[in-house]
Amino acid sequence: MFKHETVLLHETVDMLEVKPDGIYVDATLGGAGHSEYLLNKLNEKGHLFAFDQDQTAIDNAKIKLADYSDKVTFIKANFRDMKEALNERGIEAVDGILYDLGVSSPQLDERERGFSYHQDAALDMRMDQEQELTAKIVVNEWSYQDLIRIFFQYGEEKFSKQIAREIERRREVKPIETTGELVDIIKTAIPAPARRKGGHPGKRTFQAIRIAVNDELGAVEDSLEKALTLLKPGGRISVITFHSLEDRITKHLFQEATKGPDLPPGLPVIPDEYKPDFKLATRKPIVPSEEELEQNNRARSAKLRVIEKIIK
């Protein structure tokens, strides 16, 4: 069964200030926890569009949300294509959008999906099982320099060069097929004292490959930029991030959106067209409570940022 602990459930949805008759988007359906809570706040005129590129997530959500079937539309697509998918359905503007950028726990835990460094499986890591690029292709075919780049940029891995060099050495002998083989390579490449600190030695490398396979950061940036153009005045976007890379992108985009155009010097009054279109609804990110952390350790690195389109 598709089980997933929803992080910052009430905070994320409540910060959208849901209107009962509004149109909302869950950009990352996953285990449907946020969707269920949001649907509960909508009347018969309200509607939710729920996106996921994983068919398993959609199939399970249809069962979980069966009582709300007339209020929800499921769309199998990457959230970077959200605006186009909504426009195709006649939706030009919405009242709120939420993102939970954590990988769904069920995907991490399904052995055959090849996300986990705890279980041996084929190197896969695709969110969308229909796409061609897999972790196996990245590990076996990408250049030494490209591997260093993704391990350093996406994994913030100090031993990027050593790991890339060991991958290169091993794949010359035979293709690297499984997550278990990759874990063994990482453990060989990282010096013993460093291996004993800071959690599993494969964590950063696996994160980097997963981000590369799914172009996660590019998708986040594209999607958020489009999401800002979809908001009605007074509408809000809630974004939960789980690592510094996504949080940096979200923070930067939100800050840029709240600036407004450059002002000509010497204006006594600021004309409306020079006032910003957006304001931050969260000056500092909202983080999980101690109580939530006790129940769900995966929430530890979660941060929630919210932006609002200003009514002029």
From Swiss-Prot:
Which residues are S-adenosyl-L-methionine-binding?
Answer: A32, G33, H34, D52, F79, D100, Q107
The GO terms describing molecular function are: rRNA (cytosine-N4-)-methyltransferase activity
* GO biological process entries: rRNA base methylation
Q: Which InterPro entries match?
A: RsmH, SAM-dep_MeTrfase_MraW_recog, SAM-dependent_MTases_sf
List UniProt keywords, sorted A-Z.
Answer: Cytoplasm, Methyltransferase, rRNA processing, S-adenosyl-L-methionine, Transferase
Q: Name one GO cellular component term.
A: cytoplasm
- EC no. given is 2.1.1.199
Q: Catalysed reaction(s)? A: cytidine(1402) in 16S rRNA + S-adenosyl-L-methionine = N(4)-methylcytidine(1402) in 16S rRNA + S-adenosyl-L-homocysteine + H(+)
Q: Which domain of life is it from?
A: Bacteria
Q: Where in the cell is it found?
A: Cytoplasm
In the record, the note on similarity to other proteins reads: Belongs to the methyltransferase superfamily. RsmH family.
Protein task: Specifically methylates the N4 position of cytidine in position 1402 (C1402) of 16S rRNA.
Name by which UniProt lists this protein: Ribosomal RNA small subunit methyltransferase H
Q: Which organism is it from?
A: Listeria monocytogenes serotype 4b (strain CLIP80459)
